[in-house]
Structures are given as structure tokens and as C-alpha cells.
């Protein structure tokens, strides 16, 4: 079903609209006409019907009518992670969340996933570790095609601190089946005032290069200057940086 994103979206819209338009407590409507119109294979119908029954129940309970968006937000990353759908360029600002501020369950998952990719820096540096590096590595692993490029805003510690050493190596997981990154020189933004974020930032660049990792260069392009405001437009910032 995820092979055709437009058809999948139409299916979810139909389910959400039918769940919301039926009378509370009424029988769950049939989806047969939707299945026929969208040519949904027989082997997928039981799972979809089960999901639809859940959507109807949630509507009857007066809970938020967000479930169509919820289903799409779960499914679209799965679609994007398929090799044929991976992107040429990733640009973004991964979430910055220190290990010490994670819940116990999040800490366990973070450590497990970090250890599997060679990103775990050890218990003595655990409280300094940050979700941003794992998020960046995982995003490249799932969504960036081999040869595709990225530019990501990370805490400045990503370019020169010990707890990011595994991230800067460019190899995440086994050399034969893991993800490899070829880094280019990062931007060091710590000397810009005021900071854009509560902590100093950097921008890291590179490309996916499976089997041919290149560690992040130690030399960085250093930006300095004082901005008129943290969110200044580039036309203003360009004159003072």
C-alpha cells in the first residue's frame, strides 16, 4: 500500500471521514466499496478493517479526531525509508536532548541504539551525550540514498568533544552492513553572538558513502560576528558575519 503514497493518503482520508461522520455507537461501516475503488489487495484488508474499527471506537469515546494524521505520520517515514524512495538531500535541525533529561525508557533505547552504531561514549560521559548525533546518523541511515548529501544543525560539541567521537568517525555499525558517511568540513558557529539556541551550534556536512567512511575533518570553517537579533534575516546577518 505504501508504494503509492497518493492512494494510501486517500485510503486514510476515507477511513477518517467515515469514522467521524457515522452516528456515535452505530455499526462500523463496511469498507468494501473503498477497497474496490482503490484496488486494495485482499491480504491487506483485515488489518485495515481492524484499524478502522479502532478509529470508530476512538471517535465514539469523544477522543481527538487526529487519527488520520496519526496514521499518516506513522506510515510516511516507513514509505520514505524504502530504498527506492530515499532522498538526494537531507537538511534540518535534529532535536537536541541531553541524556540526563531523557526518561528512563528513552535512556535505555538511546543507549541500545547508540551502542549498535558505535555512538555510545561510555558511562562516564553518559550525562553529556545528546540525542542529536543518534538522530542525525539514523536519519541518514533510513532516508538518505547512497551518494546523497546532508547539512544538519547540531550542538557545537558535535565537532570536537569526546562524547561525539563515534559520530565523527563516519561509520555507524558494522563496516559491511552499517551506514557510512563521508564528512566534509563543518561550520563552527560558537563565536557568533547572540547564540541561535541555548547552546552554541555547528553545521555538519557530508554525504552517504556506504563502505567508504570519511571521518569529520578537524579543521572547521569558523564564523564570527554579532547579530542584530537571534533570528535576523540573512540580508542583515550577511553584513556582520
Residue ranges, per PLM feature:
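Coupling/switch/interface segments within P-loop NTPase motor domains and analogous charged loops
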Residues: 1-86
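Signature of N6-adenine DNA methyltransferases within the class I
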Residues: 69, 76-241
Amino acid at each position: 500500500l505504501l508504494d503509492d503514497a497518493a492512494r494510501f493518503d486517500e485510503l486514510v482520508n476515507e477511513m477518517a471521514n467515515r469514522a467521524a461522520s457515522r452516528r456515535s455507537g452505530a455499526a462500523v461501516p463496511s469498507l468494501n466499496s473503498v477497497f474496490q475503488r482503490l484496488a486494495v489487495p485482499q491480504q491487506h484488508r483485515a488489518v485495515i478493517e481492524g484499524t478502522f474499527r479502532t478509529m470508530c471506537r476512538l471517535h465514539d469515546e469523544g477522543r481527538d479526531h487526529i487519527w488520520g494524521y496519526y496514521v499518516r505520520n506513522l506510515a510516511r517515514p516507513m514509505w520514505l525509508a524504502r530504498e527506492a524512495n530515499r532522498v538526494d538531500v537531507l537538511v534540518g535541525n535534529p532535536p537536541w536532548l541531553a541524556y540526563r533529561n531523557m526518561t528512563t525508557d528513552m535512556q535505555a533505547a538511546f543507549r541500545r541504539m547508540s551502542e549498535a552504531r558505535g555512538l555510545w561514549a561510555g558511562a562516564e560521559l553518559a550525562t553529556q551525550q545528546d540525542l542529536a548525533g543518534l538522530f542525525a546518523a539514523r536519519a541518514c541511515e533510513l532516508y538518505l540514498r547512497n551518494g546523497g548529501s546532508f547539512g544538519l544543525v547540531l550542538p557545537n560539541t558535535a565537532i570536537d568533544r569526546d562524547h561525539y567521537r563515534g559520530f565523527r568517525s563516519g561509520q555507524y555499525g558494522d563496516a559491511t552492513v552499517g551506514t557510512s558517511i563521508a564528512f566534509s568540513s563543518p561550520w563552527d558557529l560558537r563565536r557568533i553572538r547572540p547564540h541561535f539556541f541555548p547552546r552554541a551550534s555547528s553545521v555538519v556536512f557530508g554525504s552517504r558513502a556506504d563502505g567508504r567512511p570519511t571521518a569529520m575533518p578537524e579543521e572547521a570553517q569558523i564564523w564570527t560576528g554579532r547579530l542584530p537579533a537571534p533570528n535576523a534575516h540573512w540580508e542583515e546577518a550577511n553584513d556582520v558575519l
